[in-house]
Amino acid sequence: MSRFQRLTKYVAIGGGAALLLAGAAYLAGAKVNTTKSIPVGLYWKSNAPVEKGAYVMFCPPQVGVFSDAKERGYIAGGFCPGDYGYMMKRVLAAKGDEVAITDAGVRVNGGLLPHSALIKADPSGRPLPRYQSDSYTLGTAEVLLMSDVSDTSFDGRYFGPVNRSQIITVIRPVLTW
């Protein structure tokens, strides 16, 4: 067997093993985030309760704002109903919290959230949706899903509260950068 054939054989075996390992990790609960909405990195599915501060993975509801977002490329296609890809965000408000969404940003119980000022247009100049709420108290089944690390995330400031039933799982960071 030539040197090239041996090298090809080892690369193929190594590549196959890496694919099997990645598939097993995914099935066991590993999730990779490559967006700016939460810190980039490796996350693990958790049975923890959905509460303020938790990172979650959710399926967008089948409503117009998400259809437009998918059409514009803000969210990907995937395996959620409506052919949406799942999204990862942080729960920054929950039951009983007072939420106000204005041009200045999102306030929860009077405090302005970082990175929450509304951006009027996307990089292509298209107007972004606007969820306007001067004051709204979240109900039992509602959460506000936001980014607390990115000014440009497509999050609750544009689509408003989400029903807890849309949440697939809580995710915990394993390795982020």
Swiss-Prot record:
Protein role: Required for donor-specific phage sensitivity. May be involved in pilus assembly.
Gene Ontology process terms (BP): signal peptide processing
Matches recorded under Gene3D superfamilies: Umud Fragment, subunit A (2.10.109.10)
MF (Gene Ontology): serine-type endopeptidase activity
Superkingdom of origin organism: Bacteria
Signal peptide residues on this chain, from the entry's feature table: 1-30
Keyword Signal included in the entry's annotation: yes
GO cellular component, one term: periplasmic space
Pfam families named in the record: Peptidase_S26 (PF10502)
Compartment(s) of residence: Periplasm
Keywords (A to Z) from UniProt: Conjugation, Periplasm, Plasmid, Signal
Family note: Belongs to the peptidase S26C family.
Record-given protein name: Plasmid transfer protein TraF
Gene giving rise to this polypeptide: traF
